[in-house]
Amino acid sequence: MGVNVLASTVSGAIERLGLTYEEVGDIVDASPRSVARWTAGQVVPQRLNKQRLIELAYVADALAEVLPRDQANVWMFSPNRLLEHRKPADLVRDGEYQRVLALIDAMAEGVFV
């Protein structure tokens, strides 16, 4: 994935979830300055950061289909009983984005969560 494609992917996730650079940095374990440089296409993140950013963008795409931006942001940072009271953002940070996607899929199917 090229610098500009990744920058667009990161920027899209930030926009869809209404995230700040600090929030993205918390999710991918990076400084807000690094996130700003990634979104500007100035640098390419290291492998693990890149992987987490791609996973975050994937989650953002799915969540944008079921919740408006302001609700999606709150949902990402709120403890959830169906995730053992963990925050979806924390699961993405820990590489467990598939659990978050499963919950989003359940929401899309009309399962009350």
Swiss-Prot record:
What is the deletion mutant like? Answer: Essential, it cannot be deleted. Deletion of the mbcT-mbcA operon has no visible phenotype.
Keywords associated with the record: Toxin-antitoxin system
- Specify the inducers: Induced by hypoxia. Expression probably induced in both active and resting C57BL/6 mouse macrophages. Induced in persister cells. Induced by Ethambutol, Isoniazid and streptomycin treatment and by starvation, repressed by rifampicin treatment. Probably part of the mbcT-mbcA operon.
Question: What job does this protein perform?
Answer: Antitoxin component of a type II toxin-antitoxin (TA) system. Neutralizes the activity of cognate toxin MbcT by blocking access to the toxin active site.
User: Origin, by domain of life?
Assistant: Bacteria
* Coiled coil (UniProt feature): none
Biotech applications:
Molecules that disrupt the MbcT-MbcA complex could be candidates for anti-tuberculosis therapy.
Q: What is this protein called?
A: Mycobacterial cidal antitoxin MbcA
Provide the family line: Belongs to the MbcA/ParS/Xre antitoxin family.
Q: How does it assemble?
A: Heterotetramer with 2 subunits each of MbcT and MbcA; the tetramers further assemble into trimers with 3-fold symmetry.
For the keyword Chloroplast, the answer is no
